[in-house]
Amino acid sequence: MNQEEFKQYISYAIEDYAKDKIASGNWSEDEAIDLSRESFARLLPKDEKTENNHLLSIFHNDILVGMIWISQKAPTKPNEGFIYDFVIFEQYQGQGHGKKAMKEAEIIAKELGMNKIGLNVFGHNKIARGLYEKMGYEITNITMSKTI
């Protein structure tokens, strides 16, 4: 991902993450954008050049259809990765781009020395959950809540 692609991605991602955190009941609408900005600033202090973070643009026929962000978990566990974000833009969903991109991301992760990848998916994101399950990802933790 180059600097221009990162600028496009980060403005989209901050808003999208804020919406997901609101939908999941974690954040209020009043605080969501600020908290989302803070999260991205903390995780990507050097933007697309942040060490051990690999932000990849996903193209189909020279058209940007999405992106994926893979991070090596920690210096003490360089063989473990974490997918912080994975987006196929809405107009390109359901066309096989997600499955293809996940397969390619796994190849890249292996080339970087990773042998395990984790990710988080919001409970309300049934489409993403379905894709990850089809790709062989297994549930390792479940957080549940109830409004009373």
What residue spans do the PLM features occupy?
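Conserved acetyl-CoA pyrophosphate-binding loop and the N-cap/start of the following alpha-helix
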Residues: 92, 96-104
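Acetyl-CoA-dependent GNAT
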Residues: 3-89, 139-148
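Conserved active-site alpha-helix within GNAT-family acetyltransferase domains
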Residues: 99, 123-141
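Short glycine-rich hinge loops at helix-strand junctions in the catalytic core
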Residues: 96, 113, 136
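Active-site acidic-Proline motif in GNAT/NAT acetyltransferases
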Residues: 89-91, 95, 123-124
